[in-house]
Amino acid sequence: MAAAKLEDADALIDSVETFIFDCDGVIWKGDKLIDDGVPETLDLLRSKGKRLVFLTNNSTRSRKQYGSKFRTLGLTVDEEEIFSSSFAAAAYLQSIHFPKDKKVYVIGEEGIINELELAGFQCLGGPSDADKKIELTPGFYMEHDKDVGAVVVGFDRYFNYYKVQYGTLCIRENPGCLFIATSRDTVFQLNGVQEWAGGGSMVGAILGSTKQEPVVVGKPSTFMMDYIAKKFGITTSQICMVGDMLDTDILFGQNGGCKTLLVLSGVTSHEMLQSHNNSIHPDLYTNQISDLLAVKAATV
Ligand SMILES: [Mg+2]
């Protein structure tokens, strides 16, 4: 069924208890708010007693680091309301009781290492492998740690062949080693100027050399939906998922049984939404989240 344009913001707000917002392309683009109405929109929803949750597939930062980004942008958000795919990787390993004497090899940035260490896991790789190079000289043999029991792969601006080879050796040679992806995002708005290759490109490299499918912990996997619903004791039918990407945010909301609202302020254009090639249809769409303020204007 084709998505309907958001006309009655009041009815939407009244029909749900919790809003889960994606961040890139919804709340901000790079280091700027999507529009000046964002703080007022969040304030309005809070004043109506709505629970707000922020969920990003971007794993470069930890929850704590995202907390300071929200504050820098002038938004009052509690760190407990923020969930990132870096946190999801740690929460997933905890949920399966990943042994604390095993290690995790990280292809990704600081956020993943921070969250894993905060959860008490031993990590290798991450930013410390950023400058490593491999010289394929005759007879060169690369050692790897046999205690690595999981390889976590996320978006990584310092991706290199050393990391690919290290992760590949762990997955192929350590019995039972897990392959975990924080997300498989195609592209995202890193700096607000153009689209940049997302975490899916790093995950694809490891998939290519191991022929293994990863466990995805970020959107559209329902792992974080189940986690958030359980943590706050909410029913997913009482949630509205708000995002700018069809194959991550909207699919995540639909997989979880939520209402879905697509905003056109990020990577998805109106043409892409209406295209015959698109099979993912949100319940509603609108230009930007501050359109939810229409309710306020209408009642004045
Ligand atoms: Mg987004």
Q: Where are the regions a protein language model picked out?
A:
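Asp-based, Mg2+/Mn2+-dependent phosphohydrolase catalytic module
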Residues: 1-23, 28-50, 59-80, 90-300
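Conserved glycine-rich Rossmann-like NAD(P)H-binding loop of the short-chain dehydrogenase/reductase
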Residues: 53
